[in-house]
From Swiss-Prot:
ATP binds at residues 10-15, 128, 137-138, 195. Keywords: ATP-binding, Cytoplasm, Kinase, Nucleotide biosynthesis, Nucleotide-binding, Transferase. The gene is adk. Gene3D superfamilies: P-loop containing nucleotide triphosphate hydrolases. Monomer. It holds the Pfam family ADK. GO terms for molecular function: adenylate kinase activity; ATP binding. This is Adenylate kinase. Consists of three domains, a large central CORE domain and two small peripheral domains, NMPbind and LID, which undergo movements during catalysis. The LID domain closes over the site of phosphoryl transfer upon ATP binding. Assembling and dissambling the active center during each catalytic cycle provides an effective means to prevent ATP hydrolysis.
Length: 212
């Protein structure tokens, strides 16, 4: 089974990806892991990626696409199938993935989209606070400290609501064309992500069993 998982930051995509890998035995292909492995193994694309990263520059699409292609061509993919996580990030990368899969004789079986209302995600992501003395992390709503005094806690700049909203807006703008592309191919299953982790996975599992 060859899958793609999508979802906004804070939707719980990483948690569900880990559960899918555990339950269905597919190879988990996350962009971060892929880059690290390609650079460690000094593949052609890995060396290219490292040259950009070392200069503090963004890795161009063609290099990212090349690293994905290298990984998808490995033997375990034909045996186990894959779960792509964190790629494609742009519609151009989605088109490149289509071409790569066709070239390798592979087919995408489904796209799992973990849906959570952005307003809920802002609450999830912007509630994080850190104790100034101990460095411990808490959440204002979901895991509040027992003896909360505002002056004892601070919030990281990228956890502030306005920053979180900007980040979500960018992700929505990038993600919508990709989802639309796969919807036209009849591949997308939307999963309600604003429920307990076990309930989300029950819905994911049901959708994937129907694909088999």
């Amino acid at each position: 089974m060859n899958l793609l998982i999508m979802g906004l930051p804070g939707a719980g995509k990483g948690t569900q990806a880990a559960k899918i890998v555990e339950e269905f035995g597919v190879a988990h292909i996350s962009t971060g892991d892929m880059f690290r492995a390609a650079m460690a193994n000094q593949t052609e694309m890995g060396r290219l990626a490292k040259s950009y990263i070392d200069k503090g520059e963004l890795v161009p699409d063609e290099v990212t696409n090349g690293i994905v292609k290298e990984r998808l061509a490995e033997d375990d993919i034909a045996e186990k199938g894959f779960l792509l996580d964190g790629y494609p990030r742009t519609i151009e990368q989605a088109h490149a993935l289509d071409a790569t899969l066709e070239e390798l004789g592979l087919r995408l079986d489904g796209v799992i989209n973990i849906k959570v209302d952005p307003s809920c995600l802002i609450e999830r992501l912007s509630g994080r606070i850190i104790n100034r003395k101990t460095g411990e992390t808490f959440h204002k709503v979901f895991n509040p400290p027992v003896d909360y005094k505002e002056e004892d806690y601070y919030q990281r700049e990228d956890d502030k609501p306005e920053t979180v909203k900007r980040r979500l807006d960018v992700n929505i703008a990038q993600g919508e064309p990709i989802l639309e592309h796969y919807r036209k191919l009849g591949l997308v299953t939307d999963i309600e992500g604003n429920q307990e982790i076990t309930e989300v996975f029950a819905d994911v599992e049901k959708a994937l069993l129907e694909l088999k």
